[in-house]
Amino acid sequence: MNKNDLLKKINSYPYWYHKIDLGNGVVTPGLELDPLWNNLRKTRDKINYKGKRVLDICSFDGMFAFEAEKLGAKEVVATDCLYRSQENFLLCREILKSEKTKLFYNVSPYNLVDRLDVFFGEDYGNKIKKHYKKFDIVQHLGLLYHLRDPMFSLSQARSVLKKNGKLLIETDVILNEKQSILAYNGIPNLGRYRNNVTVWWIPSKICLFEMLEASLFKIEKSTYREFQFKTPQKKFSKISKKDKFLKKYKIGRCAVVATAIDFKDLNFKAAKEISRTFRNPGLVTSLL
């Protein structure tokens, strides 16, 4: 496909989220989010991708999945459940001549374990050992705040990571709150903090760290990066006067690396509580 034909093909797709460099001066027309992505890349630099198996959750157009391959990953599995992004991903994979990145479609972040079991069974056969169904790195990027149950997703991510594997997470964060809080954005269209119908929760930094620790992760604090990423904010006309204090929060973005740990790395009471499946249904303890 020549450059002009490729540009026509790209522009025929109704929506692009990522700006993916396809070579020969062609970049997909994604959103202007370079400060956000570059902040994430600086945190990602702390992870060695060479020879690793990588899971990219909710990959969308696949930018960070393809970048993982470029960084030396031996295999990348990209998952998503948005139909409109599937064609974009497959086109980019074709143009980039990607051989190590696979798209596994119709995978919710809430059922990674079950859906990936199908993937591994179909792709590798049923005799595959349990430990091989896990990943060295899980990329959980721009996702946490979109989820009604964010901790369930973190537990699912931990369940498919090897011990000492790395979780790369990027999310909205409250920049100016030192207490552990998880701010509720309100029912869709209320937009207390973010004028985005898909945003449910925004954690403070300490809350994010505690959520990760409660999902069997150790925070690599030296990798943490944050900045005030300005997004269009909704006027507070729909918020009552008693809720005006909500404006005090500065919403930004952060990225951090966390390492997968075992129950034995926690104190006894915490390990006992976290391991109860009826309390923590997202964590599949038989895989740990």
Kindly give the residue locations of the regions a language model identified.
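Short N-terminal micro-motifs specific to bacterial/archaeal maturation
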Residues: 27, 45, 129, 141-144, ...
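Tryptophan-centered motif/residue detector
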Residues: 15-16, 89, 141, 200-202
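Conserved sugar-transfer catalytic core signal across GT-A, GT-B, and GT-C glycosyltransferases
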Residues: 64, 143, 153
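S-adenosyl-L-methionine-dependent methyltransferase catalytic module, highlighting the catalytic core
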Residues: 111, 121-125, 135, 139-140, ...
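Short, electropositive, low-hydrophobicity segments enriched in small/polar residues
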Residues: 62, 66, 146, 169
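Catalytic metal-binding/acid-base residues of hydrolase active sites
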Residues: 82, 144, 173
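Conserved N-terminal segment of class I S-adenosyl-L-methionine
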Residues: 1-133, 251-288
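Receiver (REC) domain switch-region micro-motif
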Residues: 54, 138, 143
